[in-house]
Amino acid sequence: MEEKFVGREKELADLNELYAQDRFQLFVLYGRRRVGKTTLLNEFCKDKKSIFYSAEQSNDKLNLEKFSAQVFGFYNESNLEPFSSWTNALSYIDERQAGERIVLVIDEFPYLVRKNRALLSEFQHLIDHSLKNGNLFIVLCGSYMGFMEKEVLGSKSPLFGRRTGQLHMKSFDYHDSMKFLENFSAEDKLKLYGAFGGTPLYLQQVAPNKGFEENIKDNFLKITSYLYEEPLLLLRQEVQEPGVYSAIIEAIARGYTKANEISTKIGEDAAKCLKYIKTLCELGIIYKETPFGEKETSRKTIYGISDLMFRFWYRYVFTNRTLIETGARDAVWLKRIEPDYANYMGTVFERVCKDYLSVKNAKGELPILFTSIGRWWGTDPATKSQVEIDIIAGDSDDYMIGECKWRGEKLDISVLNDLRHKADVFSKTRDHTWYVLFSKSGFTDAVIAESKKDDSIILVDLDALFK
């Protein structure tokens, strides 16, 4: 399915700026599947002389043969024997370009290196001895983020110090995702974002002339739809035991977020389960989270699902596939999705509100310039009860502490008072604290009056999220 080029203007501008420097470039582009890496590169290359090769999951010999054919086709050569090595292939391009600016893209680069571990060293040698003196623009692109970060960008990689630029390409945040959802109300935009996430190809499945319910039924509850089997197809492409990985994602989607809870739920050894979890993190499918201010090794570590479409699918589709495939899609909507969706949207809304603050922070439009943002959870020493803070953003001892409510009623003063108490549980030694209240349905008169008296209270409703 062809992906339209929407957004990514900054990323495209950055690539074109590097291209304009007219010297050797080694650019590394990575990010999980479907975020639009290939679409960005196609857009970048469309007005430039370029050789674009997408590696395949075959052996080194076959990849080299197909790469050779791509190169010979670019130079209008025929009846030539394939290159005997990658060094010969790259040297041929280097010699033929003769000062001409050419872009060489190798997509799915990890497929090549897994079959030929010496390839990275071959690249290193060529860069150091010839390529760096020319103006070839090389892009190495990959979806396995752990591999790209360690084997290509890492300090022990033969290519360490040779790259001239890199980009970790992520899914769109809610703000950029709205470019695909312009025909909907503010509430429906966020509800659709909660199901389709920020992946461009998934957002393109939304029909602008249909409502939220119809879009969910047509895209997730119809067995012929593009998204109906998408998560399973992606897992089969990336891992050898998709069933176990799928069980882990489902467990997290059902609320089992600690490592021991996940291993118990799926019936796997804890150590083995952690290996699977690490792989899913490296693929960008799940993420690791610790309370704000605590080390990554914290015993309070939990896991979440990065891609909202995966989160929706494993919560509502995976466990209901038998019903869906026997024609009960309307019943699945009425009994399983619609009654639970407001609860599901609570976590989605928190993510949206965090994105909102991050964008405002980057523009310098907040009372502080925070250096980190996250959630916090811990124990109230007075009551011995668990306390959770939806958002904490901080810089030194200045904090913005937020509460996010996706409810049908207006947020009242009790929520503000409770948030102040939570802030004290988190830390009593704060220099300055701002309280940010996010509400789907607005605020009571008492909350609005309090915010007018106290500049440390910031109110954000749905309209403000879209300004």
Residue ranges and their predicted role:
Residues 1-330, 334:
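Phosphate-binding site recognition
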Residues 301-467:
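A cross-kingdom feature that marks ATP-driven nucleic-acid transaction machinery
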